[in-house]
Amino acid sequence: QLNNQYPGTYFGMIISKMQSKNPLVSHLYFDDIDFTDQCIIRSSLLPNRIQTYFQTHSNWPNSKYGFHDAIDVIMDYAKVNEKVAEFCMYNMLDGFYNTGQTDKKNNPIWGELCDYIMNEYIFGEGCGDDIEPSDLLKERASQFKNLQVGSVPPNFSILDIQKSII
């Protein structure tokens, strides 16, 4: 409706796509978004739609690999544009990491999903030969990896009680 009021504008395009035209059909959920248009990363469109997609179509906790399948669907759409793909990878990685940090049950799935995104898409070949994640994304992913339980944390400095750096 707003797209009709403001045809051809960024505002109209983004607002008109905030909700899927096919909210209950997983393989059509993102069909109304033009993933080749990298301007979609400058709004809350993708984070909102990705989160709603996970909530609606991951079937978690009933399906052990529901989130993995959902990640793959999102990346199949996103990989048509390198910047959009990178935005989606980081958005999902950050979302799962932060969910894991606040999960009172300490469910290991959140860390496993971070590993899946890093191993399959950021450091792996999940996007094919056309998408090469930037050094910045690889560095951020490495920082996520270093913060996981069992990993060697990065070097850091703190002040002792005498205010000396240790």
Predicted regions and their residues:
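Oxidative protein folding and maturation machinery
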Residues: 1-161
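Short active-site neighborhood of thiol/selenol oxidoreductases, capturing the structured segment around
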Residues: 166
